[in-house]
């Protein structure tokens, strides 16, 4: 389509020390996203007892950065580790797993924990991950100081994962995207929206969007980074999966959701934004994976840094500018009727 030029702004706080690298010279193919030249930013054996860190979430904290990281232990079981950084590129990890406690202050250790997201709503930080609750299910915890991590009761029934909390309440309620599934490595999946007054009781479930007719996301999709509030709507980076004759391929897609009712998809990009191309995305424990979990973004400059897991083995970093990525999504948008349905015939 003809390029749409937007006067779009982020409705978020400035982050002047957002990690950034200018776009490389030369022709650009596809979306206006480019990789950090020193990728991967986290390599193998990043700390004692952990073989790989990948699908992980980071955010500004004070004048530095903090993150929750999926660490695959040397026994193969995933857990969540805390990390600190001055520049959001070079990370120091705490050797011990995050010590969750229940609401009575008693230790609560999930059987496993993976693919965390980290979102601040008002004055509290929330970690959302996938854990075992008679199958893959959503785990949640809250902290105000990154010292005490209080687990919140199971928000949803199994089987569900890829839960992403919105960074502010909408109409007084917490809002969360999730991806219900079956009991295995799901051969299907759509993104749904649920809301809650208290993070305990969830309801008003709405369908947001299904897998795409485009082949890159024709098997299943799932939420990625916490949505970014903009003057055009909620900017969502998500993952889409293609089923090939030789396994799954995970790419990064983009959509813009209605600001007041995020179950309505305003724009959804027909093309992938980033797909496995580099060695660290194509080769690894699970080949051909780009799995977005977080962004750091600066409202003053429009800079967006996207953090993604690569091949279930590394953490990659990519960059884009707000106006360019919104223009690209709008210019190449396809929205189907299924993207706005609430289940009424």
Regions found by a protein language model. Name each.
Residues 225:
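Catalytic core of Fe(II)/2-oxoglutarate
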Residues 3-111, 119-219, 228-288, 299-303, ...:
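Beta-rich carbohydrate-recognition and catalytic domains
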Residues 293, 297:
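C-terminal substrate/ligand-recognition segments
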């Amino acid at each position: 389509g003809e390029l749409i030029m937007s006067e779009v702004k982020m409705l978020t706080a400035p982050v002047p020390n957002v990690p950034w690298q200018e776009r490389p010279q030369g022709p650009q193919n596809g979306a206006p996203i480019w990789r950090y030249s020193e990728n991967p930013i986290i390599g193998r054996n990043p700390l004692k007892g952990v073989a790989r860190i990948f699908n992980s979430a980071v955010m500004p904290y004070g004048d530095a950065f903090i993150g929750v990281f999926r660490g695959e232990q040397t026994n193969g079981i995933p857990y969540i580790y805390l990390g600190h950084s001055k520049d959001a590129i070079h990370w120091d990890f705490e050797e011990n797993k995050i010590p969750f406690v229940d609401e009575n202050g008693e230790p609560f250790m999930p059987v496993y924990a993976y693919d965390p997201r980290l979102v601040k709503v008002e004055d509290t930080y929330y970690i959302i991950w996938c854990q075992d609750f008679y199958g893959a299910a959503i785990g949640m915890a809250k902290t105000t100081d990154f010292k005490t991590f209080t687990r919140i009761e199971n928000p949803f029934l199994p089987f569900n994962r890829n839960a992403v909390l919105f960074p502010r309440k909408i109409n007084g309620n917490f809002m969360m995207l999730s991806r219900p599934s079956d009991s295995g490595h799901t051969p299907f999946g759509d993104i749904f929206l649920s809301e809650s007054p208290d993070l305990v009781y969830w309801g008003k479930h709405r369908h947001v969007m299904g897998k795409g007719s485009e082949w890159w996301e024709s098997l299943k999709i799932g939420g990625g980074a916490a949505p970014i509030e903009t003057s055009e709507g909620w900017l969502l980076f998500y993952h889409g999966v293609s089923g090939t004759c030789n396994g799954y391929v995970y790419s990064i897609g983009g959509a813009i959701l209605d600001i007041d009712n995020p179950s309505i998809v305003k724009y959804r990009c027909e093309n992938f934004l980033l797909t496995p191309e580099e060695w660290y995305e194509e080769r690894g424990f699970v080949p051909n994976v780009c799995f977005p979990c977080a962004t750091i973004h600066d409202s003053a400059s429009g800079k967006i840094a996207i953090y993604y897991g690569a091949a279930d083995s590394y953490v990659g970093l990519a960059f884009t500018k707000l106006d360019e990525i919104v223009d690209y999504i709008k210019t190449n948008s396809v929205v189907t009727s299924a993207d706005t349905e609430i289940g009424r015939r």
